[in-house]
């Protein structure tokens, strides 16, 4: 992990087309601005974790299992 010290209005460039700019620094909070191509997904860490967790739960739900069982039974019935 690269760790940098930056002041307000400073920026960090990643690759050729991603810029992270320090917008403001307050007590216990830093506001960042991101400039990146539209195809680049930018998410807060906690949001990414929540999405991953929900996707994992959804894939293990009883509904998904029931659909899988129905698909299996339909395939077996066609034989």
From Swiss-Prot:
Pfam family of the protein (one): CsrA
SUPFAM superfamilies for the chain: CsrA-like (SSF117130)
Family annotation (InterPro entries): CsrA (IPR003751), CsrA_sf (IPR036107)
Subcellular location: Cytoplasm
Keyword Repressor (UniProt): yes
Keywords noted in UniProt: Bacterial flagellum biogenesis, Cytoplasm, Repressor, RNA-binding, Translation regulation
Role summary: A translational regulator that binds mRNA to regulate translation initiation and/or mRNA stability. Usually binds in the 5'-UTR at or near the Shine-Dalgarno sequence preventing ribosome-binding, thus repressing translation. Its main target seems to be the major flagellin gene, while its function is anatagonized by FliW.
PANTHER family in the record: CARBON STORAGE REGULATOR (PTHR34984:SF1)
NCBIfam families, per database record: csrA, PRK00568.1
Name of the protein: Translational regulator CsrA
Gene behind this protein: csrA
């Amino acid at each position: 992990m690269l760790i940098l010290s930056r002041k307000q209005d400073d920026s960090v460039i990643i690759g050729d087309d991603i810029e992270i700019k320090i917008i403001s620094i307050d007590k216990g909070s830093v506001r960042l601005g991101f400039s990146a191509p539209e195809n680049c997904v930018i998410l807060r860490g906690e949001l990414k974790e929540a999405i991953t967790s929900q996707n994992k739960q959804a894939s293990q739900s009883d509904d998904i299992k029931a659909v899988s069982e129905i698909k299996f039974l339909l395939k077996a019935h066609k034989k």
